[in-house]
């Protein structure tokens, strides 16, 4: 399996962020983060985790009352360990978005680079079954950075925030995004990411 295929298999930031299945048991903490994540003065609780391969970890956090698959705002952390380069991870995601945009014009994205980190701001959507209307619009701001955890393990970390609108609320979503787009970008960029200890 070449590097590109390997990254694609465990791609950081999958399209329509959560295609996650509900977990009936308490989610496993893989990244050594104690308790909640406080983002923009709001507490997010660990709601779902996954460790499908030996070098990939994903954790999703929701506010109380939201559920996976029907959230309004979600915070996520993903890590791929090993010698993968940050620019390769971002490039795979951008390539994915370009392919989706070819058949879905609403898809849009922009990247920003600063201090060795990369931020990706992108918009995706999902249509109703008949294809006539938008059923979900999802805006994501992802922040990629190289890390070394407490035990010396190297990897690429993604910290991201996803915002969704459904059905009739989509009409209000776009004007609000236009007026306040950089608010979320600045918040994600300034967020102090918790110290990570990757599970062995």
Model-based region annotation:
Residues 42-82:
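Secretory pathway targeting signatures of secreted, lumenal, and periplasmic proteins
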Residues 9-19:
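Bacterial N-terminal signal peptides
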Residues 99-146:
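Signature of long, low-cysteine stretches enriched in small and polar/charged residues
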Residues 23-54:
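N-terminal "mature-domain start" segment
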Residues 153-200:
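Surface-exposed amphipathic alpha-helical segments
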Residues 71-110:
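Mid-chain, structured segments of secreted extracytoplasmic proteins
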Residues 67-70, 127-136, 167-169:
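Short, cysteine-centered beta-strand-loop-beta hairpins and adjacent loop/turn segments enriched
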Residues 1-11:
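Bacterial N-terminal signal peptides that target proteins for export
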